[in-house]
Amino acid sequence: EIISEKAVNEPIAEINTAISAAKSVNSKDANANLTAGTVLMNSTKTALKQVRDIVGATSTKYQIVADNLAKQILQCGINYYNNASDDDVESPRKAMSFQAYALQIAIGKLTKDRCQENYDILKKAVDNMPPAEVAIETRKIKEELRKFCQQPDKISHSITLLNNTKPLLQTIKAKIG
């Protein structure tokens, strides 16, 4: 009993230290959260498995540490996605890997539900993304449409929109048909 207690405390402490390090990152810094989430996910896999192997997946100790880890990985993904620049067209896919892993390791119902909710939001965003090879053109077209919507209703603005988007649409057609 005492030996298993000591054996489990070390990986739990390792996980808690990694969680604290990820929490200390500026929540508004997208790239810092991407890095922190990746490091947190990769650096704790072995320790989490050790805890599960020692005390079992149904143990309260394991459930608490797994849920805390899932919540922080989830938060890194949320912070990254919410603060990623518009130029980062892959942000939904990158954040989704965090949400998927957090959902996989979460145990408690509240944590699982929160992970599932965020996973579903990103899944919808990923499903609605243009193919990667035309993401830049798609973004430029959206920007042209945004500018157009702010203009008064005049034929000249419509012509400008058409002239600015025609080469982009032709490029998209050439790339994906």
Question: Which functions belong to the PLM regions below?
Answer:
Residues 1-49, 62-86, 97-100, 109-177:
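Amphipathic alpha-helical repeat scaffolds of TPR domains
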Residues 52-53, 100-104:
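Amphipathic alpha-helical segments of tetratricopeptide repeats
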Residues 55-61:
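Short linear interaction motifs
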